Structures are given as C-alpha cells and as structure tokens.
Amino acid sequence: MANSTHTELVQTNGDALWTFLRDKEEWAKLIPGYLSHEVQSADEMMWEFKGNFGVVEKAVKVQVKIKEIIENKKIAFDLEGISDNINGEGYFEMEEVEEGKYNVIGNLNMKAGGFLAAMINPVLEKYVPQTIEQHVQAIAQHISQATV
C-alpha cells in the first residue's frame, strides 16, 4: 500500500482551520487534478480528479466515506474506487504548535487491486506522496490567504 504523510505550518485561528477541515467540500476542491465532486450525504461524497499515473493521465472517481471525526482535531475517511479498483484511506489533522500557529497534517494510503495491481501499485508509490504533499500545501495556502 502506498502511504505518505505531509505537514505544513499555518498561521491561523484554530476555529477557522477546523471549520475548513470539517467541510469536506472545501478541501475536495483543492485535490490536485480536481474535476468535480458530488455530496451524497453528510458522510459520503464522490470525487473525480485527473491523476497522472506514470505514462497515463486519466480521470479517476472515488467514493469518500467519513469514518471518524474528532472535533477540533481530525477528520478521517475511506476511499473506494468507482472507476478503478483503487481503494484506501486518509485523514487531515490539525495540531497546535503555539498560539495562532498550527500544523496541518495530511495522510493518504492507496492500494490497487485486481489484475492490474502489479502494474498500478508501483505507480501509486510515486503518486501518493506527490498528491498528499500538493493537497496539504494547497490547504495551507488557502487557509493562510483566508486569514490575511
């Protein structure tokens, strides 16, 4: 399973950061390669994004199911491939470093299944770290600009 965690420091108010992280529609729009999303319920949504998987660039659809919310701390989710046999999980977490400064931590795990797994999993080893790094950077930049 491809796994990566990325952390960015942001200067912001904790309530503003949690409000943003709690609203999955907000951070869905910041996914690298974002194409669209659709909210299906309070705990489920569908993401569609364009991923660069080595020599192939393609649109991928995944079902996102919120599995855990720790208020003012963490939101965790499961991913289930709709268009492809790629599943995983992830989370976003906020950690106060000092007053007005927070680490935004993002984690993503993805694994391909099926007959193409042997080809896709090595590509995910490169894709997952790049994706979570870019996503957390985009979240940090968005939060920083919103609080200026």
What are these regions (language model features)?
Residues 1-46:
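Hydrophobic ligand-binding cavity/cleft-lining segments
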Residues 7-11, 38, 65, 78, ...:
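Generic structural detector for well-ordered beta-strands
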Residues 38-80, 134-142:
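Glycine-rich portal/gate segments that line the openings of hydrophobic small-molecule binding cavities
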